[in-house]
A protein has these predicted regions:
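Noncatalytic, solvent-exposed loop/strand surfaces
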Residues: 18-456
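Bacterial N-terminal signal peptides
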Residues: 4-16
Length: 456
């Protein structure tokens, strides 16, 4: 009887592993890098290797997520503005266009969740989750539906800070529960002008939300997935700054940690919200999401000015692990670089190379274990308008999506080499693709694409 239970458990574990490989449940799982798969194409266009393309009503920059035959995306209806490709703020330079978009006095927006069929692109269902006016203004290239949803395979969990909304929806489109997410009490915080962007994280039966878009207050909270019950919340004042970095659940041999890059530092908590360690020394604006590769944690912040630090951290730390003046490493900081971080895109580690994409169209590679430069900043295309989406990689190729809708394909290796570009003809902003089941699901400004080999 006992041996039968062991066999059953092993079968269940193997099925779980297969299932996980077939799904893309949240923002940048696997840190944007997937195993080699001959089914995945490296060339496509507006018609070549396009399995389907469908319109997505509304505006939103959340990334698509996939579970089985379901493709989920969010958007907001009523926001008729359409962002245009163009350089974002970087290197401390002011933009040439207005940066803030105020909410009209009579605004009435609808926050939507869409479920598309993975095989055909057909809309399975759509669900309105909330209606009303956004609580804050936004940056002119942001949206009021920028956060990526998450799923545990049974429900989709949607968080949109401009609506004060946290909701759980099952795979048939039924709203299971909703919860109003309170903003900091009036007087404790100024209203940030940029809008939010940090997506939720999920671990077992817990959802983690972070809010760092207010200039002088920050909070981190956990909720139960079953009913949306609040489990704990930390709220603190901070030195003026803004952040949009998604929290990261770091599982390693010693323990499970919740990592945030905010408040001008890297913070680690256990899943019950107890502080484990912190590292001071980030810049005032944090956007890239922390991630782990080959046993190391990568955290960075790249705006404003010349101070753009990257920190590579070993597991097992406790307390304050901040570098002393003049140090670039210590017991738990494997290496650091004060001028390597990007502003919007999150970097990737691929084939032992830390690859960094800068919004102004520059690309670098460093040894992921030591920080040694493999090659310095290389210009991708002088004609490109800017890069906001995070890179991804597979099959010895690195993919860089410009806001013009061009995806540049690089050969991974010690030399900078562009092989070709795939033009999609529609703006790509901060949405990263889902790479699953031998296909890519890419979100452009108005459409959702399934890229897959259609010819052999």
């Amino acid at each position: 009887m006992r041996s039968g239970l062991v066999v059953a458990a092993l079968v269940a574990l193997s099925l779980t592993a297969v299932s996980a490989a077939d799904n893309w449940p949240h923002f940048r799982p696997f840190a944007g890098v997937v195993d080699d798969d001959p089914r995945l194409p490296d060339t496509w266009g507006t018609k070549e290797n396009v399995a389907w393309k469908v319109a997505v009503p509304g505006l939103g920059w959340g990334s698509p997520i996939v579970w089985g035959e379901h493709v989920f995306v969010t958007a907001v209806l009523g926001d008729d503005t359409r962002p245009k490709p163009g350089l974002v703020i970087e290197d401390g330079k002011a933009p040439s266009t207005p940066t803030y978009w105020q909410v009209p006095a009579n605004a009435n927006y609808r926050w939507m969740l869409y479920d598309f069929d993975f095989k055909t692109g057909k809309l399975r269902w759509e669900r309105e989750l909330k209606q009303g006016a956004p609580l804050t203004p936004r940056y002119h290239k942001n949206s009021f539906a920028t956060e990526t949803p998450v799923t545990d395979g049974q429900r989709v969990y949607v968080f949109h800070a401009p609506a004060g909304l946290l909701a759980a929806v099952d795979f048939s489109g039924r709203v299971v529960w909703t919860r109003q997410i309170d903003q900091p009490v009036t007087g404790q915080a100024d209203v940030g002008p940029f809008g939010p962007g940090a997506s939720p994280a999920i671990y077992r039966n817990r959802l983690f939300l972070v809010s760092d878009e207010h200039p002088n207050v920050w909070w981190l909270a956990a909720f139960d997935t079953q009913a949306g019950k609040p489990l704990w919340r930390i709220q603190e004042a901070k030195e003026r700054g803004f952040g949009w970095s998604t929290p990261f659940v770091w599982e390693h041999g010693a323990r499970t940690e919740l990592i945030t890059v905010s408040k001008r530092r890297v913070n680690s908590y256990d899943i019950d919200g107890r502080p484990l360690w912190h590292l001071n020394g980030l810049s005032g604006s944090t956007t890239p999401t922390p991630f782990a590769a080959d046993g190391l944690l990568y955290a960075s912040s790249g705006y404003p000015g010349a101070f753009r630090p990257v920190y590579v951290i070993r597991p097992g730390a406790s307390g304050d692990i901040t570098l002393k003046e003049g140090e670039t490493s210590n017991e738990f900081v494997a290496w650091s670089n004060p001028a390597l971080a990007t502003y919007l895109p999150s970097p990737i580690v691929y084939r032992n190379q830390l690859c960094s994409l800068f919004a102004r169209g520059l690309f670098t590679c460093h040894d992921a274990k030591t920080g040694k430069e493999i090659y310095g900043r290389q210009r991708i295309d002088p004609q490109a308008s800017g890069f906001s989406a995070s890179p991804w990689a597979y099959n010895g190729r690195i993919f860089l999506a410009s806001e013009d809708g061009d995806v540049y394909v690089l050969e991974a290796g010690p030399q900078f080499k562009i092989l070709h570009k795939n033009s999609m003809g529609e703006m790509i902003h901060t949405a990263s693709p889902a790479i699953v089941q031998g296909s890519l699901i890419i979100r452009t400004v108005s459409s959702l694409w399934k890229i897959a080999r259609t010819t052999r």
